[in-house]
């Protein structure tokens, strides 16, 4: 398994040169992550669920400019990648089926990454 701390240590020891094995492991791990979160709306959808589970309509309301079709597509992909889970239940008021979406344990681990990305994004924009 790729260990970024080991590779950083190795890079400084080798005067910022990196071995082919480490470079490949890093790139594979990065591509794995990007395959899961890549897309215009995926991280925004995940962000809506950081504090609490959300209904489909909540996500649509919170993310102005996204179509219902795109929400559905992105949620399905996030479910397939075990980032989001769909929780179906019966609405006690109406007796109708309802669905909520919540983050899995793996999805919750994205919060720190998203905070770092948002911080970097703001600094990058301010520096430009």
Can you say where each PLM-predicted feature lies in the sequence?
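Short, polar/charged, Gly/Pro-enriched helix-capping and turn/loop motifs at alpha-helix termini
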Residues: 73, 85, 124-127
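Amphipathic alpha-helical dimerization/coiled-coil segments
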Residues: 2-18, 47, 102-128
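Generic structural signal for well-ordered, non-membrane alpha-helices
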Residues: 54, 76, 80, 112-115
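Short, solvent-exposed charged binding patches
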Residues: 85, 100-101
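A short, conserved structural fragment
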Residues: 79-89
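N-terminal helix-turn-helix DNA-binding core of bacterial DNA-binding proteins
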Residues: 25-70, 76, 90-100
